[in-house]
Amino acid sequence: MKAIIVLLMVVTSNADRICTGITSSNSPHVVKTATQGEVNVTGVIPLTTTPTKSHFANLKGTKTRGKLCPKCLNCTDLDVALARPKCTGTIPSAKASILHEVKPVTFGCFPIMHDRTKIRQLPNLLRGYEHIRLSTHNVINAETAPGGPYKIGTSRSCPNVTNGNGFFATMAWAVPKNDNNKTATNPLTVEVPYICTEGEDQITVWGFHSDNETQMVKLYGDSKPQKFTSSANGVTTHYVSQIGGFPNQAEDGGLPQSGRIVVDYMVQKSGKTGTITYQRGILLPQKVWCASGRSKVIKGSLPLIGEADCLHEKYGGLNKSKPYYTGEHAKAIGNCPIWVKTPLKLANGTKYRPPAKLLKER
């Protein structure tokens, strides 16, 4: 109690000017705090940036996949996925991939009914694997499959490397070889063995051909709609072919086609057998995709220019200059800043206090 009285005496009798608090110059920095609202501070470090849109780039520290087959000229990713003639080549391994074709289509060969199946998803399915390769051997002998013997159909619209008639390497167009087996048939079943290396997923492409009644009788001896079923890895899919009603369509300078093909795929896990049940017009599986590992996929555009820390669906390639960013929120891969709704600042100074008022001597 005595100490307090003495202190008061000193303040009132000996000090004519006492300044309390911290004196500093005026500060333009304002931060919003959780407990005190907006507060002036003597210094801040910005933690956020607002990116500007840029081209997509290769992700630093890893290989980034643009086109499935960069050296396959004049080929779409679906052409590569179906192994169209002149569209086969090495697919580089990659831990990150750019989804640059929203609705993949084939550039030529036989007219495909893209929207009857999930075939448009095939390039993106393959893109999601780190390692992808096309088998060197056919998965089944199409010529001697049930319902045969068959001759393997080709098309002038699918020129091969010698500019002869060709077809997709992933499928064999099974056409009855002679008049004796150009007849209607009950559903037939073929087993599709697993031929990839243990641990790889096997992606098996198959399909069926249909045409107008005249052509169906000429090719297969049956003009009725045909039934097809695939089954693998617990997934079963059914189709019935459509007969006729297609306008003539030419692909890559070939003859006008009145027919269409429907193409699908099934995924066979390591060591697992698949089955296909079919009637006339079957496109039997041949070369299969063997795939392993995982590649992160993000929507973007080509070409890939330079390198970046982060790939962002809305902004392209970003280099991380701040830990957070504001702007459009979207999927991003790599060493990316974190999205926040409003800018963040880190106060690296002290709370600003105006100079204390002078106490006048009594």
UniProtKB/Swiss-Prot annotation:
Glycan-linked positions: 40, 74, 160, 181, 212, 319, 348
- The molecule here is called Hemagglutinin
Which keywords label this protein?
Answer: Disulfide bond, Fusion of virus membrane with host endosomal membrane, Fusion of virus membrane with host membrane, Glycoprotein, Hemagglutinin, Host cell membrane, Host membrane, Host-virus interaction, Lipoprotein, Membrane, Palmitate, Signal, Transmembrane, Viral attachment to host cell, Viral envelope protein, Viral penetration into host cytoplasm, Virion, Virus entry into host cell
Database matches in SUPFAM superfamilies: Viral protein domain (SSF49818)
Q: A single GO molecular function, which one?
A: host cell surface receptor binding
Role played: Binds to sialic acid-containing receptors on the cell surface, bringing about the attachment of the virus particle to the cell. Plays a major role in the determination of host range restriction and virulence. Class I viral fusion protein. Responsible for penetration of the virus into the cell cytoplasm by mediating the fusion of the membrane of the endocytosed virus particle with the endosomal membrane. Low pH in endosomes induce an irreversible conformational change in HA2, releasing the fusion hydrophobic peptide. Several trimers are required to form a competent fusion pore.
Post-translationally, this protein is described as follows, namely: In natural infection, inactive HA is matured into HA1 and HA2 outside the cell by one or more trypsin-like, arginine-specific endoprotease secreted by the bronchial epithelial cells. One identified protease that may be involved in this process is secreted in lungs by club cells.
The organism's taxonomy opens as: Viruses, Riboviria, Orthornavirae, Negarnaviricota, Polyploviricotina
The cellular component terms of Gene Ontology attached to this UniProt record, alphabetical and capped at eight, are: host cell plasma membrane; membrane; viral envelope; virion membrane
Something else known: Major glycoprotein, comprises over 80% of the envelope proteins present in virus particle.
Family the entry assigns: Belongs to the influenza viruses hemagglutinin family.
Any signal peptide, and if so, which residues?
Answer: 1-15
Which Gene3D superfamilies does the annotation name? 3.90.209.20, Hemagglutinin Chain A, Domain 2 (2.10.77.10)
Organism (species): Influenza B virus (strain B/India/3/1989)
What subunit structure does UniProt give?
Answer: Homotrimer of disulfide-linked HA1-HA2.
Which GO BP terms, alphabetically? fusion of virus membrane with host endosome membrane; fusion of virus membrane with host plasma membrane; symbiont entry into host cell; virion attachment to host cell
Location within or outside the cell: Virion membrane; Host apical cell membrane
Q: What's the protein's topology in the membrane? A: Single-pass type I membrane protein
Q: One Pfam family from the UniProt entry?
A: Hemagglutinin
